[in-house]
Amino acid sequence: GGVALAHEYAAVAFNRRPQFLVNGKRESKMYGDCSEPNFLGYEGPSDHSADMLYTFDEQRQLTGALVCIPCPSQVYELHRFISADYWGEVRTQLRAELGNIFVLPLCGAAGDQNPLDLVRISKDNKRELIVWNAQETEVDRSFDMLRECQQIGGRICDAVLRGYRQARNEIQTRPVFRTNCFEMDVPLRTVEKADVDAASARIEAVKAACPAGGRLTEAQMIRCFEDIGYLNRWKLQQETTRFTFPIFVFRIGAAAFATNPFELYVDYSYRMKARCKARQAFIIQLSSNAKGGYLPTQIAVDGGSYGSKPVSTMVGPEGGDELVEKTIAAMDALF
């Protein structure tokens, strides 16, 4: 058999961290309402790349497609059912065009991304965005989720088909294949004692307001999530100041693949893709059993909100910089 590579574009990801002017400062808000008068713009970029690796049998017939899109499949976010989300539509539409091929989805760096355009949906979802931002319960937003998945699936399918028309003429039967797996460690994001003490006081206040023998509601538990995170981080940083996790890198032909265990913000991926020796780089997030959480940029930490605070991040921007340098070095060593 053989393989072939292709790079295309599909508009799937949108930044999910709009920024607002609050008391003269820029503040970020995960899933904020962009129709508010103090909306300033987005905290960071989006990546509309679509990276593909196609597999072929000995008769040069297509057998599968690995598709890397830097966006989580979360159209159905905050609903209590299992779904393949837009990837189900990608598989259906691709198989209608290319036959019963195997489709392997990969999520590129997308910690600050989501598949919905907040500028477009904010006007009709003002109440829903408040619930969505709180992440405390299910929320039915004012748009057709199935239709969104079908449209996203169509855009990805178009990119895969465009790439296939090029790739089928560039099949490699003996590509260079090299691989490496190693343990990487980067600085653990630490917290200050004053913040831990304040978090502990807030938790005790919630406990005091709860009837004896009673249970916290789901919303109350979620509101304690951030403060519990401060306590847990303080305990962890007494034991270590490094976060360790497995990294897998491999080369197939002119492409490099690198994993990480984070919801990695797009800017880090851009740096790795631009600076590595590989002509094409697949930066694959959330791809080990290590629980890395989000890995925000300094701009995100300064902006605040979920996805940039200690409770949802094991590593901060300093660790992100180190991840970039070490990952580039590991990929380049394969060339």
Regions found by a protein language model. Give the residues of each.
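Non-catalytic substrate/cofactor recognition surfaces at enzyme active-site rims
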Residues: 1-335
